[in-house]
Amino acid sequence: MAIRAEDMWQSSLKSRGDFQRDGAAGRLSDRLLMTAESVWQEAMEKQFLREMADGTLRPERFRYYMIIDDLYLIEYIKTLRIIEERSAEPEIRRFLQDTIKATEEELRRVHIPNMVQLGITEKEIAETSVPEKVKDYILYMRGLALERPVLESLTALLDCSWAYAYIADHMVGRYGEKIRNSPYRDWFTAYTSREYTDSNRAWIDMVDSLADSPDEERQEELCRIFVTCAGYENDFWDAVYCGEE
């Protein structure tokens, strides 16, 4: 994988931590973070992520990840569109339209260049089966989008965005020079970039605004949804590491 110019790496370091909450009390996002943080920390110990950070991940494993993540993101965008169609609030619809554009930009900026460089073809993508655990994750989010209120749906999908920002940020801090010299450093650059962290912050703020004063029972349910998705994310890392030997 090609190494980007030095200024790209420095830019990613400057944006590190910008996705973090400002510590204001009483926000749903504070509670979500407390609920899922230990699961995200477990993710950082997954072999796939550790080997990507230190540069020892086998290329065929990264190739398989790129295919599965591409298939996942296509379904993720479809789920966002379902939420948009079900929402009656213009502000929420605008936010979702912006989020869809940002996710599509992630595909263009991160996925397509990597897949072209890896020689991944459309035929290869079409012939690849999604692992069962990843299918379960997609169906879980899709069910929430179809059946539950917008806040529950957005909370579920937020985990993926926030987890990537959190994991990339903390692993850059932990691995430092190893990531800088890793053939996979572009992945960490992408998910610590200003564009990505700004998009993630907007999502956190939207969830907080929708959860202005939920009762305790609903907050607990939202936390349960969020941490369930965090668990599915960890299953995802296991699936992409073991799925293509």
Descriptions of predicted regions:
Residues 64-75, 98, 102, 221-228, ...:
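A non-catalytic, amphipathic alpha-helix used as a structural packing/dimerization or gating element
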Residues 2, 9, 221-245:
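Acidic, carboxylate-rich catalytic segments that either coordinate divalent cations
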Residues 83-87, 145-148, 171-175, 210, ...:
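Secondary-structure edge/capping motif, primarily at the C-terminal ends of alpha-helices
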Residues 12-16, 33-57, 76, 204-213:
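Short alpha-helical hairpin
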Residues 37-42, 57-86, 155-165, 237:
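Alpha-helical bundle segments that constitute or directly flank the non-heme di-iron/ferroxidase center
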Residues 91-198, 227, 231:
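Active-site-proximal alpha-helical scaffolds that flank and shape metal-associated catalytic sites
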Residues 19-24, 28-35:
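N-terminal regions that are enriched for targeting/export leaders
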Residues 193-226:
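Long amphipathic all-alpha helical oligomerization modules
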